[in-house]
Amino acid sequence: GSIRAPQWVKGGIALGPKPRSYKYTVNKKERRLAIKSLLSSKVLENELTVVDTFGFDSIKTKQMVNALTNLKVEGKTLVLLPEKNENVQKSARNIEGVKTSLVNTINVYDLLKYKNLVVTLDTVKKLEEVYA
């Protein structure tokens, strides 16, 4: 045999680590059902806040902090937007525990991770179209 066999000094490793993918896919119907049930549980537990719109003229973190405190939202918060709004997204990105996401990219993990959910009226309409 070889002098690099595993049983010898300076030999190879017998059963070394092998790369493994921990990726897990969920069926579309199951994912949609999970999102539906999470959204309804947020409504039942009063963790859903609906606002008319975020009318930010400029990118100011202070505006977003004031908006969230006026809504009496505390803790981890997910802000769902109907379409890309750079002013809102950049205003919220430096606030700890606040994440912005588009309505077409929501996932079960974020809905579970963030206690509060803040949505606009347009977002509610889009959610009703997709999940009603």
Each model region followed by its residue ranges:
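DPxDG-like acidic metal-binding loop motif
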Residues: 1-17
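Extended polybasic, low-complexity segments that bind anionic RNA or targeting/receptor surfaces
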Residues: 16-132
